[in-house]
Protein backbone atom coordinates (compact mmCIF):
# COMPACT_ATOMS: atom_id res chain seq x y z
CA UNK A 1 0.00 0.00 0.00
CA UNK A 2 1.12 3.53 -0.73
CA UNK A 3 2.48 5.28 2.33
CA UNK A 4 0.46 8.22 3.65
CA UNK A 5 1.82 11.37 5.24
CA UNK A 6 0.58 14.30 7.30
CA UNK A 7 0.34 18.01 6.60
CA UNK A 8 0.88 19.96 9.79
CA UNK A 9 1.10 23.67 10.35
CA UNK A 10 -0.05 26.77 12.13
CA UNK A 11 -2.39 29.57 11.11
CA UNK A 12 -1.31 33.00 12.36
CA UNK A 13 -2.51 36.57 12.17
CA UNK A 14 -0.24 38.33 9.65
CA UNK A 15 -0.37 41.55 11.68
CA UNK A 16 0.69 40.35 15.12
CA UNK A 17 1.82 36.74 14.80
CA UNK A 18 -0.93 35.52 17.14
CA UNK A 19 -2.40 32.08 16.36
CA UNK A 20 -5.85 32.00 14.77
CA UNK A 21 -7.95 29.46 16.65
CA UNK A 22 -10.67 27.37 14.97
CA UNK A 23 -9.78 28.48 11.43
CA UNK A 24 -10.82 26.20 8.57
CA UNK A 25 -7.93 24.54 6.70
CA UNK A 26 -8.67 22.26 3.75
CA UNK A 27 -6.73 20.81 0.85
CA UNK A 28 -7.56 22.99 -2.14
CA UNK A 29 -10.37 21.68 -4.35
CA UNK A 30 -11.25 18.89 -1.91
CA UNK A 31 -13.40 18.51 1.18
CA UNK A 32 -10.51 16.98 3.11
CA UNK A 33 -9.41 19.25 5.90
CA UNK A 34 -9.57 20.19 9.54
CA UNK A 35 -9.95 23.06 12.02
CA UNK A 36 -7.09 24.65 13.94
CA UNK A 37 -6.93 24.07 17.68
CA UNK A 38 -6.83 26.69 20.44
CA UNK A 39 -3.20 27.57 19.61
CA UNK A 40 -3.71 27.76 15.84
CA UNK A 41 -2.15 24.42 14.94
CA UNK A 42 -3.63 21.88 12.54
CA UNK A 43 -2.94 18.42 11.14
CA UNK A 44 -4.36 16.72 8.06
CA UNK A 45 -3.55 13.00 8.06
CA UNK A 46 -3.65 10.27 5.44
CA UNK A 47 -2.25 12.43 2.62
CA UNK A 48 -0.82 10.53 -0.36
CA UNK A 49 2.40 11.74 -2.05
CA UNK A 50 1.75 14.49 -4.57
CA UNK A 51 1.38 18.24 -5.05
CA UNK A 52 -1.13 20.22 -3.01
CA UNK A 53 -2.36 23.66 -2.03
CA UNK A 54 -4.00 24.58 1.27
CA UNK A 55 -6.98 26.89 1.66
CA UNK A 56 -7.42 28.68 5.00
CA UNK A 57 -10.30 30.90 6.08
CA UNK A 58 -11.85 32.39 9.19
CA UNK A 59 -14.45 35.03 9.96
CA UNK A 60 -12.91 38.51 9.86
CA UNK A 61 -9.95 37.47 7.69
CA UNK A 62 -9.29 37.34 3.97
CA UNK A 63 -9.39 33.74 2.67
CA UNK A 64 -5.97 32.51 1.58
CA UNK A 65 -4.77 29.84 -0.84
CA UNK A 66 -1.12 28.84 -0.46
CA UNK A 67 1.39 28.24 -3.20
CA UNK A 68 1.71 24.65 -4.34
CA UNK A 69 3.96 22.35 -2.36
CA UNK A 70 5.00 18.71 -2.56
CA UNK A 71 4.51 15.72 -0.27
CA UNK A 72 7.04 13.02 -1.18
CA UNK A 73 8.94 11.24 1.58
CA UNK A 74 8.19 13.24 4.71
CA UNK A 75 5.48 15.03 6.65
CA UNK A 76 5.09 18.71 5.81
CA UNK A 77 4.87 21.63 8.25
CA UNK A 78 3.28 24.65 6.61
CA UNK A 79 2.75 28.05 8.29
CA UNK A 80 -0.15 30.14 6.96
CA UNK A 81 -0.72 33.84 7.59
CA UNK A 82 -4.18 35.42 7.36
CA UNK A 83 -4.75 39.14 6.86
CA UNK A 84 -7.63 40.88 8.56
CA UNK A 85 -10.54 41.85 6.32
CA UNK A 86 -12.57 45.03 6.62
CA UNK A 87 -15.25 43.65 4.30
CA UNK A 88 -18.72 43.03 5.65
CA UNK A 89 -19.65 39.41 6.34
CA UNK A 90 -20.96 37.79 3.20
CA UNK A 91 -20.54 34.68 1.10
CA UNK A 92 -17.07 34.59 -0.43
CA UNK A 93 -15.48 32.48 -3.14
CA UNK A 94 -11.79 31.68 -3.27
CA UNK A 95 -9.99 31.59 -6.60
CA UNK A 96 -6.48 30.17 -6.80
CA UNK A 97 -4.17 32.08 -9.10
CA UNK A 98 -0.41 32.39 -9.62
CA UNK A 99 -0.96 36.15 -9.71
CA UNK A 100 -1.23 37.60 -6.22
CA UNK A 101 -2.68 41.07 -6.03
CA UNK A 102 -1.33 43.38 -3.32
CA UNK A 103 -1.92 47.06 -2.64
CA UNK A 104 1.71 47.91 -3.50
CA UNK A 105 1.86 45.75 -6.63
CA UNK A 106 -1.62 45.14 -8.08
CA UNK A 107 -0.23 44.21 -11.52
CA UNK A 108 3.44 43.21 -11.47
CA UNK A 109 3.50 40.40 -8.87
CA UNK A 110 3.49 36.71 -9.74
CA UNK A 111 3.79 33.96 -7.14
CA UNK A 112 5.84 30.93 -8.22
CA UNK A 113 5.03 27.72 -6.38
CA UNK A 114 6.74 24.36 -6.19
CA UNK A 115 4.86 22.78 -9.08
CA UNK A 116 5.86 25.53 -11.49
CA UNK A 117 9.52 25.08 -10.54
CA UNK A 118 9.33 21.28 -10.80
CA UNK A 119 7.29 20.98 -13.98
CA UNK A 120 8.52 23.91 -16.09
CA UNK A 121 9.66 22.52 -19.45
CA UNK A 122 13.45 22.80 -19.70
CA UNK A 123 13.61 24.49 -16.30
CA UNK A 124 15.74 21.77 -14.66
CA UNK A 125 14.34 22.88 -11.26
CA UNK A 126 16.16 26.21 -11.69
CA UNK A 127 14.16 29.30 -10.78
CA UNK A 128 15.96 31.55 -13.28
CA UNK A 129 15.02 29.26 -16.16
CA UNK A 130 11.42 29.16 -14.95
CA UNK A 131 11.27 32.96 -14.94
CA UNK A 132 12.80 33.08 -18.43
CA UNK A 133 9.61 31.45 -19.76
CA UNK A 134 7.39 34.29 -18.48
CA UNK A 135 5.97 37.04 -20.70
CA UNK A 136 8.22 40.09 -20.81
CA UNK A 137 11.39 38.11 -20.01
CA UNK A 138 13.81 37.80 -22.93
CA UNK A 139 15.19 34.46 -24.03
CA UNK A 140 18.95 33.97 -23.66
CA UNK A 141 21.44 31.28 -24.65
CA UNK A 142 20.38 27.82 -23.48
CA UNK A 143 23.40 27.54 -21.18
CA UNK A 144 22.83 30.91 -19.46
CA UNK A 145 20.52 32.02 -16.62
CA UNK A 146 20.63 35.75 -17.37
CA UNK A 147 17.37 37.53 -16.55
CA UNK A 148 16.46 40.36 -18.91
CA UNK A 149 13.04 41.61 -17.86
CA UNK A 150 11.08 44.15 -19.89
CA UNK A 151 14.10 45.09 -21.99
CA UNK A 152 16.48 45.50 -19.05
CA UNK A 153 19.88 43.97 -18.47
CA UNK A 154 21.01 41.05 -16.28
CA UNK A 155 22.51 43.48 -13.74
CA UNK A 156 19.14 45.15 -13.03
CA UNK A 157 17.58 42.43 -10.85
CA UNK A 158 17.59 42.01 -7.07
CA UNK A 159 17.24 38.82 -5.03
CA UNK A 160 16.09 38.31 -1.43
CA UNK A 161 16.15 35.14 0.66
CA UNK A 162 13.65 35.38 3.54
CA UNK A 163 14.36 39.12 3.57
CA UNK A 164 18.17 38.83 3.28
CA UNK A 165 19.55 40.33 0.07
CA UNK A 166 21.87 38.05 -1.90
CA UNK A 167 24.09 39.48 -4.67
CA UNK A 168 23.69 36.61 -7.14
CA UNK A 169 21.90 33.28 -7.45
CA UNK A 170 24.09 31.48 -10.00
CA UNK A 171 27.29 29.47 -10.16
CA UNK A 172 30.10 30.91 -12.31
CA UNK A 173 28.31 34.26 -12.13
CA UNK A 174 29.21 37.19 -14.33
CA UNK A 175 30.81 39.80 -12.09
CA UNK A 176 28.79 43.01 -12.15
CA UNK A 177 25.65 41.16 -13.29
CA UNK A 178 23.56 38.22 -12.09
CA UNK A 179 23.84 35.61 -14.83
CA UNK A 180 25.45 32.20 -14.83
CA UNK A 181 24.85 28.67 -16.13
CA UNK A 182 23.44 26.96 -12.99
CA UNK A 183 21.45 28.19 -9.99
CA UNK A 184 22.86 28.11 -6.45
CA UNK A 185 19.60 27.95 -4.49
CA UNK A 186 18.36 24.45 -3.73
CA UNK A 187 14.73 24.33 -4.95
CA UNK A 188 13.84 21.88 -2.15
CA UNK A 189 14.27 24.79 0.30
CA UNK A 190 11.76 27.00 -1.50
CA UNK A 191 8.18 27.44 -0.27
CA UNK A 192 7.29 30.08 -2.85
CA UNK A 193 8.85 32.94 -4.80
CA UNK A 194 7.37 36.41 -5.27
CA UNK A 195 8.45 37.66 -8.70
CA UNK A 196 7.97 41.43 -9.18
CA UNK A 197 8.32 42.57 -12.77
CA UNK A 198 6.96 46.04 -11.94
CA UNK A 199 5.72 48.15 -9.01
CA UNK A 200 8.41 46.96 -6.58
CA UNK A 201 7.75 47.58 -2.88
CA UNK A 202 9.62 50.60 -1.55
CA UNK A 203 11.39 48.28 0.91
CA UNK A 204 13.14 46.62 -2.05
CA UNK A 205 15.43 49.23 -3.55
CA UNK A 206 18.22 49.39 -6.13
CA UNK A 207 16.26 47.48 -8.81
CA UNK A 208 15.28 48.52 -12.33
CA UNK A 209 13.99 45.32 -13.97
CA UNK A 210 12.76 42.84 -11.37
CA UNK A 211 12.81 41.64 -7.77
CA UNK A 212 12.74 37.96 -6.76
CA UNK A 213 11.75 37.42 -3.13
CA UNK A 214 12.39 33.80 -2.10
CA UNK A 215 10.41 32.46 0.87
CA UNK A 216 11.97 29.37 2.41
CA UNK A 217 10.44 26.45 4.26
CA UNK A 218 11.11 25.93 7.94
CA UNK A 219 12.58 22.71 9.26
CA UNK A 220 10.41 19.91 10.60
CA UNK A 221 9.40 20.62 14.19
CA UNK A 222 8.86 17.00 15.21
CA UNK A 223 11.36 14.64 13.61
CA UNK A 224 14.60 14.40 11.67
CA UNK A 225 14.55 13.59 7.96
CA UNK A 226 17.28 13.06 5.38
CA UNK A 227 16.77 13.13 1.64
CA UNK A 228 19.18 12.38 -1.19
CA UNK A 229 18.75 13.87 -4.65
CA UNK A 230 20.37 13.09 -8.00
CA UNK A 231 19.72 15.91 -10.44
CA UNK A 232 20.53 16.51 -14.09
CA UNK A 233 23.92 18.01 -13.17
CA UNK A 234 24.51 17.40 -9.46
CA UNK A 235 24.09 15.07 -6.51
CA UNK A 236 23.28 16.16 -2.98
CA UNK A 237 21.34 15.73 0.24
CA UNK A 238 19.00 17.75 2.41
CA UNK A 239 18.54 17.24 6.15
CA UNK A 240 16.05 18.96 8.43
CA UNK A 241 14.50 18.55 11.83
CA UNK A 242 14.17 19.99 15.33
CA UNK A 243 17.02 21.22 17.51
CA UNK A 244 15.11 21.55 20.75
CA UNK A 245 11.51 22.56 21.35
CA UNK A 246 11.80 26.04 19.85
CA UNK A 247 14.39 25.60 17.11
CA UNK A 248 14.29 24.00 13.68
CA UNK A 249 16.96 23.66 11.02
CA UNK A 250 17.51 22.49 7.48
CA UNK A 251 20.76 22.15 5.57
CA UNK A 252 21.74 20.97 2.10
CA UNK A 253 24.96 20.30 0.21
CA UNK A 254 25.22 19.65 -3.53
CA UNK A 255 28.14 18.82 -5.81
CA UNK A 256 28.16 18.60 -9.57
CA UNK A 257 29.24 15.67 -11.69
CA UNK A 258 29.32 17.66 -14.94
CA UNK A 259 33.11 17.44 -15.09
CA UNK A 260 32.88 13.67 -15.62
CA UNK A 261 30.23 13.99 -18.32
CA UNK A 262 32.16 16.74 -20.11
CA UNK A 263 35.32 14.63 -20.02
CA UNK A 264 33.49 11.58 -21.39
CA UNK A 265 32.06 13.48 -24.38
CA UNK A 266 35.36 15.26 -25.06
CA UNK A 267 34.73 18.90 -24.15
CA UNK A 268 37.78 21.15 -23.61
CA UNK A 269 36.62 22.54 -20.25
CA UNK A 270 35.61 20.77 -17.02
CA UNK A 271 33.36 22.78 -14.66
CA UNK A 272 32.87 21.68 -11.05
CA UNK A 273 30.59 23.40 -8.58
CA UNK A 274 29.66 22.84 -4.95
CA UNK A 275 27.02 24.72 -2.99
CA UNK A 276 25.66 24.65 0.53
CA UNK A 277 22.63 26.23 2.14
CA UNK A 278 21.15 26.29 5.64
CA UNK A 279 18.40 27.88 7.68
CA UNK A 280 17.98 27.84 11.46
CA UNK A 281 14.87 29.34 13.02
CA UNK A 282 14.37 29.93 16.73
CA UNK A 283 11.05 31.05 18.19
CA UNK A 284 11.64 32.71 21.56
CA UNK A 285 7.90 33.16 22.15
CA UNK A 286 4.83 34.24 20.19
CA UNK A 287 6.21 37.77 19.89
CA UNK A 288 9.84 37.18 18.98
CA UNK A 289 11.63 34.99 16.43
CA UNK A 290 15.08 34.80 14.87
CA UNK A 291 16.10 33.17 11.59
CA UNK A 292 19.75 32.63 10.62
CA UNK A 293 20.52 31.53 7.09
CA UNK A 294 23.45 31.03 4.78
CA UNK A 295 24.16 30.34 1.14
CA UNK A 296 27.53 29.62 -0.43
CA UNK A 297 29.18 28.23 -3.55
CA UNK A 298 32.62 27.13 -4.73
CA UNK A 299 33.13 27.03 -8.50
CA UNK A 300 36.16 25.65 -10.30
CA UNK A 301 36.56 25.36 -14.06
CA UNK A 302 39.65 23.50 -15.27
CA UNK A 303 40.90 22.94 -18.80
CA UNK A 304 40.81 19.46 -20.29
CA UNK A 305 44.36 19.59 -21.63
CA UNK A 306 44.65 15.79 -21.71
CA UNK A 307 41.72 15.22 -24.06
CA UNK A 308 42.21 12.94 -27.05
CA UNK A 309 40.33 15.03 -29.62
CA UNK A 310 42.73 17.91 -30.28
CA UNK A 311 40.78 19.32 -33.21
CA UNK A 312 41.43 22.85 -34.41
CA UNK A 313 38.29 24.02 -32.63
CA UNK A 314 39.29 22.48 -29.30
CA UNK A 315 42.84 23.79 -29.61
CA UNK A 316 41.46 27.28 -30.15
CA UNK A 317 39.23 27.05 -27.07
CA UNK A 318 42.07 25.72 -24.91
CA UNK A 319 44.34 28.51 -26.15
CA UNK A 320 42.16 31.40 -24.96
CA UNK A 321 39.96 30.02 -22.15
CA UNK A 322 41.33 30.75 -18.63
CA UNK A 323 41.04 28.65 -15.50
CA UNK A 324 38.19 30.07 -13.40
CA UNK A 325 37.97 29.88 -9.61
CA UNK A 326 35.06 31.57 -7.88
CA UNK A 327 33.77 31.60 -4.32
CA UNK A 328 30.66 33.35 -3.04
CA UNK A 329 28.66 33.35 0.18
CA UNK A 330 25.95 35.22 2.07
CA UNK A 331 25.31 34.96 5.81
CA UNK A 332 22.32 36.73 7.31
CA UNK A 333 20.02 36.98 10.30
CA UNK A 334 16.43 38.21 10.48
CA UNK A 335 14.89 39.18 13.83
CA UNK A 336 11.15 39.87 14.07
CA UNK A 337 9.20 41.33 16.97
CA UNK A 338 5.40 41.45 17.01
CA UNK A 339 3.84 44.20 19.12
CA UNK A 340 0.07 44.43 18.93
CA UNK A 341 -0.67 44.83 15.24
CA UNK A 342 2.81 46.15 14.47
CA UNK A 343 5.84 44.21 13.21
CA UNK A 344 9.46 45.29 13.71
CA UNK A 345 12.17 43.56 11.68
CA UNK A 346 15.95 43.89 11.78
CA UNK A 347 18.07 42.26 9.07
CA UNK A 348 21.87 41.99 9.07
CA UNK A 349 23.98 40.22 6.46
CA UNK A 350 27.42 39.88 4.93
CA UNK A 351 28.16 38.77 1.36
CA UNK A 352 31.39 38.14 -0.52
CA UNK A 353 32.32 37.27 -4.09
CA UNK A 354 35.88 36.15 -4.78
CA UNK A 355 36.69 35.81 -8.47
CA UNK A 356 39.94 34.54 -10.05
CA UNK A 357 40.89 33.98 -13.70
CA UNK A 358 44.32 32.52 -14.49
CA UNK A 359 45.86 31.78 -17.88
CA UNK A 360 49.28 30.44 -18.94
CA UNK A 361 50.67 30.50 -22.47
CA UNK A 362 50.08 27.11 -24.09
CA UNK A 363 48.61 26.11 -20.67
CA UNK A 364 52.16 25.47 -19.48
CA UNK A 365 52.30 26.20 -15.74
CA UNK A 366 55.92 25.05 -15.32
CA UNK A 367 57.23 28.62 -15.37
CA UNK A 368 55.82 31.94 -14.17
CA UNK A 369 57.22 33.43 -17.38
CA UNK A 370 54.32 31.75 -19.17
CA UNK A 371 51.72 33.58 -17.07
CA UNK A 372 49.59 35.78 -19.35
CA UNK A 373 46.61 36.57 -17.08
CA UNK A 374 46.10 36.71 -13.34
CA UNK A 375 42.81 38.38 -12.46
CA UNK A 376 41.80 38.58 -8.78
CA UNK A 377 38.80 40.49 -7.53
CA UNK A 378 36.77 40.71 -4.32
CA UNK A 379 33.38 42.25 -3.62
CA UNK A 380 32.29 42.39 0.04
CA UNK A 381 29.01 43.85 1.30
CA UNK A 382 27.90 44.39 4.91
CA UNK A 383 24.25 45.32 5.27
CA UNK A 384 21.93 46.50 8.04
CA UNK A 385 18.25 47.06 7.32
CA UNK A 386 15.22 47.92 9.42
CA UNK A 387 11.64 47.26 8.29
CA UNK A 388 8.63 48.26 10.36
CA UNK A 389 4.90 47.83 9.74
CA UNK A 390 2.31 49.87 11.64
CA UNK A 391 -1.39 49.02 11.23
CA UNK A 392 -4.40 51.25 11.81
CA UNK A 393 -8.08 50.88 10.80
CA UNK A 394 -8.20 50.94 6.96
CA UNK A 395 -4.59 52.15 6.91
CA UNK A 396 -1.09 50.66 7.03
CA UNK A 397 2.29 52.39 7.20
CA UNK A 398 5.55 50.68 6.22
CA UNK A 399 8.74 52.57 7.12
CA UNK A 400 12.39 51.64 7.31
CA UNK A 401 15.94 52.28 6.24
CA UNK A 402 19.23 50.64 5.37
CA UNK A 403 22.93 51.22 5.97
CA UNK A 404 25.59 49.36 3.96
CA UNK A 405 29.34 49.34 3.57
CA UNK A 406 30.91 47.67 0.54
CA UNK A 407 34.47 47.14 -0.65
CA UNK A 408 35.67 46.26 -4.14
CA UNK A 409 39.23 45.27 -5.09
CA UNK A 410 40.75 44.28 -8.42
CA UNK A 411 44.30 43.08 -9.08
CA UNK A 412 45.01 42.29 -12.73
CA UNK A 413 48.26 41.18 -14.34
CA UNK A 414 48.01 40.70 -18.10
CA UNK A 415 50.46 40.26 -20.96
CA UNK A 416 49.27 41.57 -24.28
CA UNK A 417 50.93 40.24 -27.42
CA UNK A 418 50.61 42.82 -30.17
CA UNK A 419 53.30 44.38 -32.38
CA UNK A 420 55.15 45.27 -29.19
CA UNK A 421 54.42 42.96 -26.22
CA UNK A 422 53.41 44.88 -23.11
CA UNK A 423 52.41 44.08 -19.54
CA UNK A 424 49.40 45.57 -17.76
CA UNK A 425 49.50 45.81 -13.98
CA UNK A 426 46.15 47.18 -12.88
CA UNK A 427 44.80 47.56 -9.37
CA UNK A 428 41.91 49.37 -7.76
CA UNK A 429 40.42 49.60 -4.28
CA UNK A 430 37.00 51.07 -3.57
CA UNK A 431 35.16 51.57 -0.28
CA UNK A 432 31.55 52.66 -0.47
CA UNK A 433 29.12 53.71 2.27
CA UNK A 434 25.47 53.53 1.23
CA UNK A 435 22.27 54.56 3.01
CA UNK A 436 18.58 54.74 2.23
CA UNK A 437 15.12 55.47 3.65
CA UNK A 438 11.65 54.45 2.57
CA UNK A 439 7.99 54.87 3.57
CA UNK A 440 4.76 53.49 2.15
CA UNK A 441 1.20 54.40 3.13
CA UNK A 442 -1.50 51.88 2.18
CA UNK A 443 -5.24 52.54 2.35
CA UNK A 444 -8.10 50.06 1.99
CA UNK A 445 -11.73 51.20 1.91
CA UNK A 446 -14.31 49.74 4.26
CA UNK A 447 -15.58 47.20 1.73
CA UNK A 448 -12.12 46.73 0.14
CA UNK A 449 -13.49 48.08 -3.11
CA UNK A 450 -10.70 50.63 -3.40
CA UNK A 451 -7.04 50.32 -2.39
CA UNK A 452 -4.23 52.82 -2.78
CA UNK A 453 -0.51 52.66 -2.05
CA UNK A 454 1.70 55.74 -2.01
CA UNK A 455 5.38 55.10 -1.42
CA UNK A 456 8.67 56.92 -1.60
CA UNK A 457 12.26 55.76 -1.40
CA UNK A 458 15.55 57.67 -1.34
CA UNK A 459 19.07 56.26 -1.65
CA UNK A 460 22.52 57.83 -1.51
CA UNK A 461 26.21 56.99 -1.05
CA UNK A 462 29.57 58.68 -0.56
CA UNK A 463 31.01 57.86 -4.01
CA UNK A 464 30.70 61.41 -5.34
CA UNK A 465 28.82 64.69 -4.75
CA UNK A 466 26.38 63.62 -7.49
CA UNK A 467 25.30 60.63 -5.40
CA UNK A 468 25.44 61.71 -1.74
CA UNK A 469 22.14 63.61 -1.55
CA UNK A 470 19.04 61.53 -0.81
CA UNK A 471 16.79 64.01 -2.60
CA UNK A 472 18.66 63.51 -5.88
CA UNK A 473 17.57 59.85 -5.91
CA UNK A 474 13.99 60.34 -4.74
CA UNK A 475 11.89 57.43 -5.97
CA UNK A 476 8.11 57.98 -5.65
CA UNK A 477 5.60 55.30 -6.61
CA UNK A 478 1.80 55.06 -6.68
CA UNK A 479 -0.50 52.05 -7.11
CA UNK A 480 -4.31 52.13 -7.33
CA UNK A 481 -6.93 49.39 -7.56
CA UNK A 482 -10.71 49.72 -7.90
CA UNK A 483 -13.18 46.86 -8.07
CA UNK A 484 -15.69 47.58 -10.82
CA UNK A 485 -17.90 44.56 -10.16
CA UNK A 486 -17.46 40.97 -9.00
CA UNK A 487 -13.88 39.92 -9.65
CA UNK A 488 -13.24 42.66 -12.25
CA UNK A 489 -10.71 45.28 -11.14
CA UNK A 490 -9.22 48.41 -12.65
CA UNK A 491 -5.54 48.47 -11.63
CA UNK A 492 -2.70 50.86 -12.30
CA UNK A 493 0.74 51.79 -11.02
CA UNK A 494 3.44 54.33 -11.78
CA UNK A 495 6.86 54.90 -10.28
CA UNK A 496 10.39 56.14 -10.72
CA UNK A 497 13.26 53.80 -9.86
CA UNK A 498 17.04 54.12 -9.43
CA UNK A 499 19.90 51.64 -9.41
CA UNK A 500 23.53 52.06 -8.42
CA UNK A 501 25.97 51.03 -11.18
CA UNK A 502 27.95 47.83 -10.45
CA UNK A 503 31.22 48.00 -8.51
CA UNK A 504 33.18 47.10 -11.65
CA UNK A 505 32.00 50.41 -13.12
CA UNK A 506 32.35 52.52 -9.96
CA UNK A 507 35.85 51.21 -9.20
CA UNK A 508 37.31 51.53 -12.70
CA UNK A 509 40.51 53.62 -12.80
CA UNK A 510 42.31 55.26 -15.70
CA UNK A 511 46.07 55.12 -16.38
CA UNK A 512 46.67 57.91 -13.86
CA UNK A 513 44.93 56.01 -11.05
CA UNK A 514 41.82 58.22 -10.99
CA UNK A 515 38.29 56.85 -10.77
CA UNK A 516 37.26 57.54 -14.33
CA UNK A 517 33.50 57.43 -13.82
CA UNK A 518 33.68 59.67 -10.77
CA UNK A 519 35.42 62.26 -12.95
CA UNK A 520 32.67 61.75 -15.55
CA UNK A 521 30.06 62.62 -12.88
CA UNK A 522 28.41 59.20 -13.00
CA UNK A 523 25.01 59.06 -11.29
CA UNK A 524 22.42 56.44 -10.40
Give, region by region, the residue ranges found by the protein language model.
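Outer-membrane beta-barrel signature, preferentially recognizing the C-terminal barrel domain
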Residues: 311-335, 377, 428-430, 489, ...
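Face-selective signature of the C-terminal outer-membrane beta-barrel domain
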Residues: 281-299, 321-467
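Periplasm-facing N-terminal accessory domains of Gram-negative outer-membrane beta-barrel systems
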Residues: 1-91, 95
Amino acid sequence: AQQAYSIKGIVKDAANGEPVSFANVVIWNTIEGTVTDSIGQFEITGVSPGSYRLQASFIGYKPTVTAEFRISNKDMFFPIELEESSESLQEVSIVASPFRKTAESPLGLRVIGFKEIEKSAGGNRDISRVVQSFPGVASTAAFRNDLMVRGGGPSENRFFLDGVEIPNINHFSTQGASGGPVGIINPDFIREVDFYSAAYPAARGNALSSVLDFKLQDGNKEKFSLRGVIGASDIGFLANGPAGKKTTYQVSIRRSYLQFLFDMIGLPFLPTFTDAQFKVKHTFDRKNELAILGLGAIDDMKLNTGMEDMSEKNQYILAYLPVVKQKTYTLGAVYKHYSGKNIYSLIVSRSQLNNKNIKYKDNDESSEENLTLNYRSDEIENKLRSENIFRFPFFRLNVGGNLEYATYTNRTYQKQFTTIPRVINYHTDLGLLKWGLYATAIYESDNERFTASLGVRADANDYSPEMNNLLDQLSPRLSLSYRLFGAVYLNGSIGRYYELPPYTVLGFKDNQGNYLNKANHLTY
